[in-house]
Amino acid sequence: MLFSEIKFLIFMSVICLSSSHPILMLSSLILLTLFLSLIFYFIYQFSIMSMMMILIILGGMLIIFMYMISLCPNKKMSFYKKLSVTFTMMLILIPYDSFMTKLEMININKIYSVNFVNMIILMMIFLIVMLTIISKNLSWINAPIQKFN
């Protein structure tokens, strides 16, 4: 792995840990998970592992953060100028011939090959059923995920 990928992973982890607003946390976790899945794909050249990581981790995190966002008050997100300048400078300093140029070589067709169609459909159905069950359970106990007038 190159230095720029390690630098990006560390930076995204620090942003996730230092953010205080759930939406900012969620967006940094989504970026971190997508970046890690791309790294797994390039290391193993096997797309099902990266796809499973995206579906399982992000599916669970979206459900958890959906509940957390409903609990926290409606406050504005505060963006720090120093942090945004650091982030843009870091993106500028990533070499052009780095990991980001390998993104063009991703073959999406490997994900949907005939061998993995059953597993993909099973994972999608599982995530939809889990989301439905959790949202039904929360509406039964009148949790603050929905506001009833």
Curated annotation (Swiss-Prot):
Membrane topology classification: Multi-pass membrane protein
Protein name, UniProt field: NADH-ubiquinone oxidoreductase chain 6
Gene Ontology CC: mitochondrial membrane
Functional note: Core subunit of the mitochondrial membrane respiratory chain NADH dehydrogenase (Complex I) that is believed to belong to the minimal assembly required for catalysis. Complex I functions in the transfer of electrons from NADH to the respiratory chain. The immediate electron acceptor for the enzyme is believed to be ubiquinone.
Primary gene name: ND6
Superkingdom of origin: Eukaryota
Any GO MF annotation of the entry: NADH dehydrogenase (ubiquinone) activity
Family: Belongs to the complex I subunit 6 family.
Protein's organism: Rhipicephalus sanguineus (Brown dog tick)
Subcellular location: Mitochondrion membrane
Main location group: mitochondrion
